[in-house]
Amino acid sequence: MTILRKITAVIVSILLPFFLLMTAIRLVFQPVFLQVEYNAPGFPEDPYGFTVEDRLKWGGISLDYLFNNAGISFLADQRLPDGAPLYNERELGHMLDVKNLVQLMLKVWLGLFVMLALGLIWAWRGDWVPEFGRAYARGGWLTLGIIGAILIAIVVSFDWLFTAFHRI
């Protein structure tokens, strides 16, 4: 294996966990996920009195906002049946931050997909698919290691992890 192939294999192994994580996040940000979650047995009642139908409606609108090109007015203009705004100013600021992070993640996710696909094409055309496959396998093991580390961090100090995540 040439040095360039070895470097590519290492890069693939490192990039794969990020691609898989972003793929999982993208799958969660789907209307069907809201349907499954809000209709799950034992899902807690809403403290503000929203019904499951209300939650699905407003959750769907909020998901739409994260993936469309609209400004914050898309959410700021949403009104509850009594005329009150759906989001207060603090929540709107948070949703804008989430949208910016999601939009950045989508761009990075697409870039990772292109890089991994180009690597696979190069490996296929260069007849080194087995080595490339081993790089994917190492990336898979690295992904499991990262998931394990995150789970340990959650068990040891959820509050710290939650705060650190929301500083991103």
Give the positions of each predicted feature.
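Juxtamembrane interface at the cytosolic side of transmembrane helices
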Residues: 1-11, 112-160
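Hydrophobic secretory-pathway targeting helix
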Residues: 1-34
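Hydrophobic alpha-helical transmembrane segments of multi-pass integral membrane proteins
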Residues: 16, 20, 106-117
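Membrane-interface interhelical loops and short interface/amphipathic helices
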Residues: 34-85
